[in-house]
């Protein structure tokens, strides 16, 4: 996250720059909280874009994993995590440590049958099955 003064659409704005785990880089007006820009900075399949009116990502129906499962980017580790990013306003660049780790999400078979999620000791219990890209090779 970074604070900056930038020219946006011909007007100087005080902005917050943020690259969260969801894969979109946000430019947010610090005065009113409005999302001014939002573009992917890494591979993103779970959403098609960010609605600038609401500030919310628009989910991609093609990656609905309810019936058959789906590969999703970024995975639960995120496109960017706690590592610091850096901004060079003169060059117009943001330097962001990113990662692209796809995960395959699928609904647990037990849940499909019973409506109850199965808790498994020693695993991420997120209410769905998760597989890394390494698992696809096995």
Label every model-predicted segment.
Residues 1-20, 81-86, 93-98:
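Repeat-blade elements of multi-bladed beta-propeller folds
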Residues 131-136:
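Conserved small/polar residues in nucleotide/adenosyl-binding loops
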């Amino acid at each position: 996250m970074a604070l900056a003064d930038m020219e946006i659409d011909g007007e100087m704005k005080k902005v917050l720059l943020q690259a969260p785990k969801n894969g979109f880089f946000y430019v947010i007006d610090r005065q009113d909280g409005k999302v001014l820009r939002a573009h992917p900075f890494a591979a993103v399949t779970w959403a098609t874009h960010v609605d600038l009116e609401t500030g919310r990502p628009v989910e991609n129906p093609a990656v609905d994993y309810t019936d058959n499962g789906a590969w999703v980017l970024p995975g639960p580790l995120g496109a960017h995590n706690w590592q610091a990013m850096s901004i060079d306003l003169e060059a117009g660049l943001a330097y962001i440590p990113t990662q692209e780790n796809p995960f395959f999400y699928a609904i647990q078979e037990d849940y499909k049958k019973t409506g109850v999620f199965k808790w498994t000791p020693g695993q991420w219990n997120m209410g769905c099955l998760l597989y890394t890209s390494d698992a696809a090779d096995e």
